[in-house]
Amino acid sequence: MSRMNVNLAGVELKNPVMTASGTFGSGTDYSEFVDLNRLGAVVTKGVANVPWPGNPTPRVTETASGMLNAIGLQNPGIDVFCERDIPFLKKYDTKIIVNVCGKSAKDYCEVVERLGNEPVDMLEINVSCPNVKEGGIAFGQNPKALEEITKEVKKYAKQPVIMKLSPNVTDITEMAKAAEAGGADVLSLINTLTGMKIDINRRTFALANKTGGMSGPAVKPVAVRMVYQVANAVSLPIIGMGGIATAEDALEFIMAGATAVSVGTANFFNPYATVEIADGIQAFLEKQKVEDINELIGVVK
């Protein structure tokens, strides 16, 4: 059989397929459909230093070939997460990647420090959160702020740090270079694209928050392009995501330069998506007589 193992900053994954934060919880519900042991990693929903209530409803609406969400990173906080979610995930033979959110550098660092002695494998830092100190502009939309938050997090982190990049910028490579300069171990991209939908019958916004994050198949070409650009701009390993629903989608990201892939919105319309994608990649390697998945990373130049 072709080799599916990939390495992210010293963390060995049995295959390159993982979940995308916010679409899989911590796997408790999906474990009824998917054998979590078969995943390269489970990426948890965002966790903050204190509970976050999230945004008012409606929070989700469908779009052509995708969806908009404005959940607002609702989560129970780090204490509940450590007591409830980590013990559940430790029952499985898969890597645990904790997504961390915050409204200030102090918020992020509190969570990162708390996770230092927990049995988790990597940390993914969601820099699409609004920076309260800078008037609500997301950390990931300002290269200087991104470099600084990366440096701060790295001071406290005992696990490798993944910086999750926002696509809502003029130049994604500038952000990637800033995260690399700050000491990031891995980059993940893309987060959702900011979008809006109007309910014409009610003459108001479809989402209470007015705007939301767009995800699903419609964003894939943008995501593949950005992964390709970043792979050619920095030397860090990349986790690619954005509209992946099939093995063919995942392979596009890998060939563009991603070492691993995250499956998000597809989990909502197909709970078996992650394992089907892993099986599909394996079948492709066998059919193409490729001995090792790593041979395909960044093959397009």
PLM region descriptions:
Residues 48-53, 130-132, 194-197, 268-270:
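Short gly/pro/ser/thr-enriched loop/turn and capping motifs at secondary-structure boundaries
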Residues 17-20, 40-44, 96-100, 123-125, ...:
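Hydrophobic faces of well-ordered beta-strands that scaffold small-molecule active sites
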Residues 93, 116-119, 157, 281-289:
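Structural signal for hydrophobic packing residues in well-ordered secondary-structure cores
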Residues 12-14, 91-96, 156-161, 232-236, ...:
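Short, surface-exposed connector motifs at secondary-structure boundaries
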Residues 32, 103-239, 248-256:
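Alpha/beta enzyme core
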Residues 14-27, 72-74, 97-108, 162-171, ...:
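Active-site mouth loops of central-metabolism enzymes
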Residues 214-235, 239, 245-301:
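Alpha/beta catalytic cores of nucleotide-metabolism and tRNA/nucleoside-modifying enzymes
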Residues 1-96:
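N-terminal capping/small domains of soluble enzymes
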